[in-house]
A protein has these predicted regions:
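Solvent-exposed, flexible loop/coil segments flanking beta-strands in beta-rich domains
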Residues: 1-42, 113-124
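Surface-exposed beta-strand/loop patches in noncatalytic accessory domains
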Residues: 2-18, 40-81, 377-379
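Extracellular and analogous surface-interaction loops
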Residues: 25-34, 84-90, 349-351
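Noncatalytic modules at the cell exterior or secretory-pathway interfaces
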Residues: 34-37, 86-105, 460-464
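Edge beta-strands of jelly-roll/beta-sandwich modules across compartments, strongly enriched
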Residues: 48-50, 104-115
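Beta-sandwich interaction modules
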Residues: 71-90, 451-455
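Charged catalytic cores and adjacent phosphate/nucleic-acid-binding surfaces used
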Residues: 113-118, 188-202, 235-491
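Catalytic cores of extracellular degradative/oxidative enzymes
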Residues: 133-275, 283, 289
């Protein structure tokens, strides 16, 4: 969703008599604003022409100064151009500061453009699980940030093992990336992320369910969001029970594999029993790797603000879609004005005569999309991309460039499953996998985008979507996208 911006064009003539003085071009900020973009220009005129510097003040203080080094800059609540301070944008009189360093006899005219971005809903993409040199990763903080930016991500969670030092090493706001503070509680009996608080854990040394309950409960009291990580991983499963305080489960950890299928099946069972648990995913990236990469999977979060708290609010509401890659298949599910993470109220169900669903699918490349409810799979669609629009992309193109076939690439990813189970990892329950007796409908998608409609039933607890892609020569499919549910209020 594009930002709706309001634009001002301001002009300030500068006379020779004002040379070597500081001038203000005032403008008013009214109502909520999350970002201000400023650009300026004037006729330079070569060596004998004017030289005008620029900066910015708020109603309270000087916000920053570029001198003559920049022609444009921005300030936001949590991001800003280097040389400027991020922070809440207060209402009142602001001013662009002009430094009239050199002004010719004929004077100069400076044109200043000011754009305001109001808070608005938008999808933001990021990675909610990664490591750095602050624990057992090899990425420095700058390397991790650069990697995430190169992948087109807009936020990253700092989740090193049992330490908060990474959060304090990244105190300065980044111009392009939101940095979500976090920690991965890493015990000998399982791992859990705590997001949103720089120093959430008092003590990570938990060895019993009671100690885990105390530690995670205290983290939540401090404002932390708790996600149980890779709970069915053969080498580090969650063995402290599911009665501890938590908000989400990491259904998708790194490449799609059996441990994720088991987490997905468990999550589906909990949803079908009426329990509301948010599904999350993250790369768990530690170092450069062909398969484990920042943003694989990507968490797309619907947020009302380009801030850490805005992203966390979207996550807490369950407004999360998980994608294999930042540019891979993405889906949206809605019933009228109620979307992913929302509960459709009973009065709306009755007024609509059920639950009419709208399904939007973007960037699909031959995926099979399944609509799930608490009863299982309700409908299946095969998304067929016309031949002239079916060029390989994402990880498929990457594999080809590396000289690998897609089959070998995915086969190597699935080799992660070679780890021996510890005996505490449950089998995938019958009926909880993507296998279904529902006949798929063939849908041709022009430019890999399609909109579908489905008439849902009022007696379902929820609806959610999965998209998978079969790989020729393998008996397994790879998840390309999945949504959190849209819930249905029951009578």
């Amino acid at each position: 969703m594009e930002t709706k911006k309001e634009r001002l064009v301001l002009r300030r003539p500068i006379g020779k008599h004002e040379e070597r003085s500081y001038l203000e071009v005032a403008f008013a900020v009214e109502g909520p604003v999350e970002r201000i973009d400023i650009a300026y220009r004037y006729e330079r005129g070569g060596a004998s022409g004017p030289v005008v510097d620029i900066g910015l003040r708020s109603p309270e203080r000087i916000v920053g100064w570029s001198g003559g080094a920049r022609e444009a800059f921005f300030v936001g609540t949590e991001k800003a151009t280097p040389g400027y301070l991020a922070g809440p944008i207060a209402e009142g009189e602001w001013a662009v500061l002009l430094g009239a360093y050199k002004i010719p006899e004929g004077g100069a005219e400076v044109i200043v453009e000011v754009e305001f971005a109001r808070p608005h809903g938008r999808w933001m993409k990021g990675d909610l699980h990664m490591h750095s040199v602050h624990s057992d990763g090899s990425y420095t903080m700058e390397q991790a940030k650069d990697s995430c930016k190169s992948r087109g991500l807009e936020f990253m969670a700092l989740t090193d093992h049992n330490t908060a030092s990474q959060n304090f090493a990244a105190l300065a706001p980044d111009e392009q990336l939101l940095l979500i503070p976090g920690v991965e509680l890493t015990s000998y009996f399982g791992h859990a992320n705590v997001l949103g608080v720089p120093d959430a854990l008092r003590d990570f040394r938990v060895t019993t369910p009671e100690q885990a309950e105390e530690a995670l409960g205290e983290a939540r009291e401090r404002g932390g969001f708790v996600s149980l990580n890779h709970p069915f991983c053969p080498s580090c499963p969650w063995e402290l029970g599911f009665d501890v305080p938590f908000d989400a489960i990491e259904v998708w950890n790194g490449p799609w594999r059996t441990l994720n299928e088991r987490a997905l099946a468990w999550w589906q069972e909990q949803l079908a029993q009426g329990r509301r648990i948010i599904a999350l995913g993250g790369s768990d990236a530690h170092r450069e790797d062909r398969f484990v990469k920042h943003g694989r999977p990507t968490a797309s979060v619907w947020t009302e603000a380009d801030t850490v708290q805005g992203v966390l609010a979207g996550i807490r509401q369950g407004r999360v879609v998980l994608q294999f890659d930042p540019d891979e298949t993405c889906m949206a599910l809605a019933s009228g004005k109620y979307g992913i993470g929302d509960t459709i109220p009973r009065h709306a169900v009755e007024e609509q005569g059920g639950v009419p669903l709208t399904i939007d699918i973007c960037s699909a490349k031959g995926d099979r999309v399944a609509l799930w409810s608490d009863r299982g799979i309700e409908a299946v669609w095969d998304i067929v991309v016309p031949a002239d629009n079916s060029d390989a992309g994402g990880w498929e193109a990457e594999a080809a460039e590396a000289g690998w076939t897609v089959q070998r690439e995915i086969a190597a990813i699935l080799a992660f499953d070679a780890q021996e189970d510890k005996g505490c990892v449950p089998a995938i329950p019958a009926g909880a996998s993507a296998e279904s007796g529902v006949a798929p409908q063939r849908i041709e998608a022009e430019n890999a985008h399609v909109r579908l409609r489905f008439q849902g039933s009022a007696d379902r607890l929820f609806y959610r979507l999965e998209a998978r892609r079969d790989v020729e020569g393998l008996k397994r499919s790879v998840m390309t996208c999945m949504t959190n549910p849209v819930y249905v209020e029951q009578a």
